[in-house]
Amino acid sequence: MSSDKSSDSKNGLKNCDPRCEQKCETKCQPSCLNKLLQRCSEKCSLDKCPPSPNCPPCPPCPPCPLVCQSQCSTPTSPLCPPLCSPRCSGTLACCPPSCPQKGCVKPCPPKCPSPCLPRK
């Protein structure tokens, strides 16, 4: 449908905000998508920035003391920043491995292959 327009992307980029254009190609952030849909041409919208897959966001990592006291701390996913203190970095040191999974904090979902992950 927009195959011809894709090859003519240079012509379309004239109407596309330069910042929006760069973010569209590199980051594809949702916030940029909103701008793209308003300011940029069709070539710089959903075609270049596909919608992010239905991947549930990583649950926030609770503070370590609270986790160690009330819940069994599970290994935090790479998506979650290590908010726990060095004492609690070893999950086994906080709670015994015999902790039932029901009492454990839900681990982050597996990494979703999304090119639109926000860059920190």
UniProtKB/Swiss-Prot annotation:
It holds the Pfam family LELP1. The gene is Lelp1. This is Late cornified envelope-like proline-rich protein 1. Belongs to the cornifin (SPRR) family.
